[in-house]
Amino acid sequence: DVDVGDWVLAIGSPYRLNFSVTAGIISAKARSVPGQGTSYIPFLQSDVAINPGNSGGPLFNLDGEVIGINAMIYSNRGGYMGISFTIPINYAQEIIDQLREDGFVKRGWLGVSVQEVTKDLADSFGLDVPRGALIGSVLTDSPAESSGLKDGDVIVDFDGNEIIYSGDLPMVVGRISPGEEVKATVYRD
Protein backbone atom coordinates (compact mmCIF):
# COMPACT_ATOMS: atom_id res chain seq x y z
CA ASP A 1 0.00 0.00 0.00
CA VAL A 2 1.27 3.45 -0.90
CA ASP A 3 0.61 6.48 1.28
CA VAL A 4 1.16 10.19 0.79
CA GLY A 5 4.50 11.05 2.40
CA ASP A 6 6.13 7.67 1.68
CA TRP A 7 9.73 7.84 0.49
CA VAL A 8 10.33 6.38 -2.97
CA LEU A 9 13.23 5.72 -5.34
CA ALA A 10 13.36 5.80 -9.14
CA ILE A 11 15.94 4.02 -11.26
CA GLY A 12 16.49 4.96 -14.87
CA SER A 13 18.82 6.26 -17.53
CA PRO A 14 18.09 9.98 -17.82
CA TYR A 15 19.91 11.45 -20.80
CA ARG A 16 21.64 8.04 -21.21
CA LEU A 17 23.21 8.25 -17.76
CA ASN A 18 22.62 4.57 -16.99
CA PHE A 19 21.59 3.23 -13.58
CA SER A 20 20.81 6.62 -12.06
CA VAL A 21 18.84 6.67 -8.81
CA THR A 22 16.71 9.56 -7.58
CA ALA A 23 14.66 9.82 -4.39
CA GLY A 24 11.55 11.67 -3.32
CA ILE A 25 8.19 11.33 -1.63
CA ILE A 26 4.68 10.50 -2.75
CA SER A 27 2.89 13.85 -2.97
CA ALA A 28 -0.60 12.62 -3.92
CA LYS A 29 -2.52 9.58 -5.09
CA ALA A 30 -5.18 9.13 -7.77
CA ARG A 31 -4.10 12.17 -9.77
CA SER A 32 -5.16 13.13 -13.25
CA VAL A 33 -2.39 14.81 -15.22
CA PRO A 34 -3.17 18.49 -15.88
CA GLY A 35 -3.76 19.22 -19.55
CA GLN A 36 -3.96 15.54 -20.56
CA GLY A 37 -7.74 15.24 -20.90
CA THR A 38 -9.63 12.27 -19.48
CA SER A 39 -7.44 9.99 -17.42
CA TYR A 40 -8.23 6.33 -16.91
CA ILE A 41 -5.25 5.91 -14.59
CA PRO A 42 -5.09 7.27 -11.03
CA PHE A 43 -1.45 8.35 -11.21
CA LEU A 44 0.82 8.56 -8.20
CA GLN A 45 2.33 12.03 -7.97
CA SER A 46 5.80 12.41 -6.49
CA ASP A 47 8.70 14.81 -6.46
CA VAL A 48 11.16 12.19 -7.74
CA ALA A 49 13.32 13.65 -10.52
CA ILE A 50 12.17 12.10 -13.80
CA ASN A 51 13.84 13.13 -17.04
CA PRO A 52 14.00 11.74 -20.59
CA GLY A 53 15.25 8.18 -20.14
CA ASN A 54 13.39 7.54 -16.87
CA SER A 55 9.95 6.92 -18.37
CA GLY A 56 9.09 3.25 -18.20
CA GLY A 57 11.44 2.68 -15.29
CA PRO A 58 10.40 1.41 -11.88
CA LEU A 59 9.43 3.40 -8.81
CA PHE A 60 10.34 1.54 -5.61
CA ASN A 61 9.30 1.90 -2.00
CA LEU A 62 11.99 1.65 0.69
CA ASP A 63 11.30 -2.10 1.03
CA GLY A 64 12.53 -2.55 -2.56
CA GLU A 65 9.06 -3.33 -3.92
CA VAL A 66 8.09 -1.92 -7.30
CA ILE A 67 5.07 0.30 -6.66
CA GLY A 68 4.77 1.83 -10.11
CA ILE A 69 6.08 2.59 -13.57
CA ASN A 70 7.35 6.13 -14.11
CA ALA A 71 5.34 7.74 -16.87
CA MET A 72 5.77 11.50 -17.21
CA ILE A 73 6.42 14.86 -15.64
CA TYR A 74 4.37 18.01 -15.45
CA SER A 75 6.29 20.97 -16.79
CA ASN A 76 5.62 24.27 -18.48
CA ARG A 77 9.17 24.48 -19.80
CA GLY A 78 9.96 20.90 -20.83
CA GLY A 79 12.24 19.91 -17.95
CA TYR A 80 11.74 18.48 -14.49
CA MET A 81 9.99 20.90 -12.11
CA GLY A 82 9.35 18.64 -9.11
CA ILE A 83 6.13 16.99 -10.29
CA SER A 84 6.33 13.43 -11.61
CA PHE A 85 3.58 10.94 -12.42
CA THR A 86 3.76 7.18 -12.05
CA ILE A 87 1.34 4.43 -13.09
CA PRO A 88 0.51 2.37 -9.97
CA ILE A 89 1.85 -1.17 -10.32
CA ASN A 90 -1.58 -2.81 -10.04
CA TYR A 91 -2.78 -0.77 -13.05
CA ALA A 92 0.43 -1.47 -14.94
CA GLN A 93 0.02 -5.21 -14.32
CA GLU A 94 -3.59 -5.12 -15.59
CA ILE A 95 -2.41 -3.38 -18.76
CA ILE A 96 0.43 -5.89 -19.24
CA ASP A 97 -1.97 -8.82 -18.77
CA GLN A 98 -4.44 -7.40 -21.32
CA LEU A 99 -1.68 -6.76 -23.85
CA ARG A 100 -0.38 -10.32 -23.46
CA GLU A 101 -3.83 -11.86 -23.68
CA ASP A 102 -5.56 -9.67 -26.27
CA GLY A 103 -2.85 -7.53 -27.90
CA PHE A 104 -4.66 -4.34 -26.85
CA VAL A 105 -6.08 -2.64 -23.77
CA LYS A 106 -9.82 -2.92 -23.09
CA ARG A 107 -11.46 -0.05 -21.24
CA GLY A 108 -15.01 0.51 -20.17
CA TRP A 109 -16.71 3.58 -21.59
CA LEU A 110 -19.77 5.35 -20.24
CA GLY A 111 -20.30 8.17 -22.74
CA VAL A 112 -20.71 11.20 -20.51
CA SER A 113 -18.96 14.47 -19.86
CA VAL A 114 -18.74 15.30 -16.17
CA GLN A 115 -17.87 18.19 -13.91
CA GLU A 116 -17.29 18.75 -10.20
CA VAL A 117 -20.19 19.07 -7.78
CA THR A 118 -20.08 22.51 -6.13
CA LYS A 119 -21.40 23.26 -2.64
CA ASP A 120 -24.53 24.86 -4.12
CA LEU A 121 -25.18 21.80 -6.30
CA ALA A 122 -24.58 19.47 -3.35
CA ASP A 123 -27.14 21.42 -1.32
CA SER A 124 -29.71 21.19 -4.13
CA PHE A 125 -29.24 17.40 -4.33
CA GLY A 126 -29.36 16.97 -0.56
CA LEU A 127 -25.75 15.80 -0.35
CA ASP A 128 -24.04 16.50 2.98
CA VAL A 129 -20.80 17.50 1.22
CA PRO A 130 -19.86 18.25 -2.40
CA ARG A 131 -19.01 14.89 -3.96
CA GLY A 132 -19.66 12.89 -7.07
CA ALA A 133 -19.56 13.52 -10.78
CA LEU A 134 -22.21 15.81 -12.26
CA ILE A 135 -23.20 14.70 -15.76
CA GLY A 136 -22.98 17.66 -18.13
CA SER A 137 -24.00 15.72 -21.22
CA VAL A 138 -24.83 12.18 -22.29
CA LEU A 139 -23.68 10.99 -25.71
CA THR A 140 -26.20 9.47 -28.10
CA ASP A 141 -26.09 5.66 -28.37
CA SER A 142 -23.79 5.43 -25.34
CA PRO A 143 -24.01 3.01 -22.41
CA ALA A 144 -25.03 6.01 -20.27
CA GLU A 145 -27.98 6.78 -22.55
CA SER A 146 -29.00 3.10 -22.69
CA SER A 147 -29.00 2.92 -18.88
CA GLY A 148 -31.20 6.02 -18.54
CA LEU A 149 -28.62 8.48 -17.22
CA LYS A 150 -29.47 12.11 -17.94
CA ASP A 151 -27.81 15.51 -18.02
CA GLY A 152 -27.78 16.86 -14.46
CA ASP A 153 -27.55 13.46 -12.73
CA VAL A 154 -24.89 13.13 -10.04
CA ILE A 155 -23.07 9.79 -9.80
CA VAL A 156 -21.77 9.21 -6.25
CA ASP A 157 -20.98 5.48 -6.49
CA PHE A 158 -20.09 3.33 -9.48
CA ASP A 159 -19.60 -0.43 -9.26
CA GLY A 160 -19.07 -0.17 -5.49
CA ASN A 161 -16.50 2.62 -5.80
CA GLU A 162 -17.28 5.93 -4.13
CA ILE A 163 -16.98 8.86 -6.53
CA ILE A 164 -15.63 11.87 -4.62
CA TYR A 165 -14.40 14.01 -7.53
CA SER A 166 -15.55 14.05 -11.15
CA GLY A 167 -12.13 12.70 -12.23
CA ASP A 168 -12.73 9.55 -10.16
CA LEU A 169 -15.47 8.37 -12.52
CA PRO A 170 -13.41 7.72 -15.68
CA MET A 171 -10.75 5.98 -13.59
CA VAL A 172 -13.37 3.55 -12.25
CA VAL A 173 -15.21 3.15 -15.57
CA GLY A 174 -11.95 2.49 -17.43
CA ARG A 175 -11.23 -0.59 -15.31
CA ILE A 176 -14.54 -2.23 -16.13
CA SER A 177 -14.71 -4.61 -19.08
CA PRO A 178 -16.70 -3.29 -22.04
CA GLY A 179 -20.26 -4.60 -21.91
CA GLU A 180 -20.15 -5.51 -18.22
CA GLU A 181 -23.22 -4.40 -16.26
CA VAL A 182 -22.61 -2.53 -13.01
CA LYS A 183 -24.65 -0.75 -10.36
CA ALA A 184 -24.42 2.97 -9.70
CA THR A 185 -25.85 5.33 -7.11
CA VAL A 186 -27.24 8.41 -8.83
CA TYR A 187 -28.92 11.54 -7.49
CA ARG A 188 -31.41 13.25 -9.76
CA ASP A 189 -32.89 16.69 -9.08
Spans of model-derived segments:
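Serine-dependent protease modules
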Residues: 1-147, 157-181, 187-189
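Conserved catalytic motifs of ABC-family nucleotide-binding domains
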Residues: 152
